């Protein structure tokens, strides 16, 4: 489920519905705008378009506010100059709320990041982003403090800053084939400029893309969820005993060639459309060692398996990759091992967090994620169907 911005732009939502209508008409020429509007409302968790519009009005009438001291401290930490106006809330995301900060030296996007994202990680992600920007990928420019730091601790959290970039609507499923093609071209461009890495990928080592929880850990999660009286305990049991166990059986195949540092999380929420209908990549924080084959598999799952993807979206994405790279990494079931591991860990983490989430926003966000995980399950069968659809493209 998508989360509405803190001060939603109704014009953006109307544009999202129009874009969605184009995508719907790629498979059903008779699709009406009302169907696209219902689909937009549904993806934001509302039954009807009028319900969504009512929520837009409610949010705009009472946006979140930040302490004036936070704006001042952020501006001081990153040497941005004196604050001109109170910070404007942008949206609540999985790492926390992002804000628009205006100072005498410019306009900035500021947001918290996970504690494990320090300067070394941010520097790696920034180098990749700058290489990609130089190669034509649209992305905001990261900001360094006076001492060149990219991450600063402010008010008990780690923060990063980007120069403000005017962006258009979010991208919703199903995506237009032209957007899918842009995603493929963009991924190929990132792979083209990716830095070499001397890291060796070790299955089950610590890390979101490598570590897998033991049966005992899953049993403890189920027991804790049950003891807390959570209504989704039975859903968790069914997931664990069914699709998740089947996914764990997919074998790992080691990389033959050295790994590269790539974006590592090019999902549908990591992008926005720019005013010229060009794709902009706004999330680079997780950049790390990868293999083009594995990352293409990850992107295909996130853009063409999750959600209500159109038939042909995967082929359009792969065609876009070939447009830029000239060739496509061959894929098989083992190519999805990292994607599966990330899905297993995301599922585990969301059920853990939901058990003790504090605050209405955090609770609403994570419970929305649980609904999605339960309703739209990743399965081995879906991956096999994806591979079959792509033949003979890959």
Question: Which functions belong to the PLM regions below?
Answer:
Residues 61-147, 274-277, 388-394:
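Conserved NTP-binding catalytic cores of kinases and kinase-like/nucleotidyltransferase enzymes
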Residues 91-104, 109, 142, 247-294:
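Active-site acidic catalytic loop and adjacent metal/ATP-binding pocket
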Residues 1-62:
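Intrinsically disordered, low-complexity eukaryotic regions enriched in glycine, serine
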């Amino acid at each position: 489920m998508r989360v509405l911005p803190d001060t939603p732009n109704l014009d953006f939502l109307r544009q999202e519905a129009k874009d969605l209508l184009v995508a719907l008409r790629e498979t059903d020429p008779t699709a009406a705008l009302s169907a696209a509007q219902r689909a937009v409302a549904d993806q934001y968790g509302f039954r009807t378009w009028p319900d969504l519009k009512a929520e837009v009005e409610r949010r705009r009438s009472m946006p979140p506010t930040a302490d004036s001291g936070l704006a001042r401290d952020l501006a001081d930490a990153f040497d941005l100059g004196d604050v001109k106006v109170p910070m404007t809330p942008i949206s609540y995301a999985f790492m926390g709320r992002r804000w628009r900060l205006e100072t005498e030296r410019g306009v900035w996007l500021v947001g918290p990041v996970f504690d494990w994202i320090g300067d070394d990680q941010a520097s790696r992600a920034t180098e990749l982003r700058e290489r990609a920007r130089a190669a034509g990928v649209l992305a905001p420019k990261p900001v360094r403090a006076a001492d060149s730091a990219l991450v600063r601790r402010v008010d008990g959290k780690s923060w990063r800053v980007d120069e403000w970039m005017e962006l258009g609507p979010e991208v919703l499923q199903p995506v237009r084939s032209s957007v899918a093609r842009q995603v493929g071209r963009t991924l190929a461009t990132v792979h083209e400029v990716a830095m070499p890495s001397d890291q060796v990928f070790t299955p089950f080592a610590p890390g979101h893309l490598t570590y897998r929880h033991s049966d005992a850990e899953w049993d403890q999660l189920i027991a804790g969820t049950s003891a807390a009286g959570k209504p989704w305990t039975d859903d968790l049991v069914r997931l664990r005993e069914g699709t998740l166990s089947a996914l764990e059986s997919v074998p790992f195949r080691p990389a033959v060639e050295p790994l590269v540092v790539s974006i590592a999380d090019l999902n549908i929420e990591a992008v926005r459309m720019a005013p010229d209908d060009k794709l902009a990549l706004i999330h680079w924080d997780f950049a790390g060692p990868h293999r083009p084959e594995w990352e293409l598999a990850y992107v295909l799952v996130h853009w063409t398996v999750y959600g209500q993807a159109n038939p042909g979206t995967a082929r359009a994405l792969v065609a876009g990759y070939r447009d830029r790279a000239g060739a496509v990494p061959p894929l098989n079931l083992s190519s999805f091992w990292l994607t599966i591991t990330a899905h297993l860990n995301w599922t585990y983490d969301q059920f853990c967090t939901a058990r003790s989430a504090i605050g209405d926003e955090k609770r609403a966000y994570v419970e929305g994620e649980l609904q999605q995980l339960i309703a739209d399950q990743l399965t081995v069968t879906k991956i096999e169907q994806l591979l079959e659809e792509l033949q003979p493209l890959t």
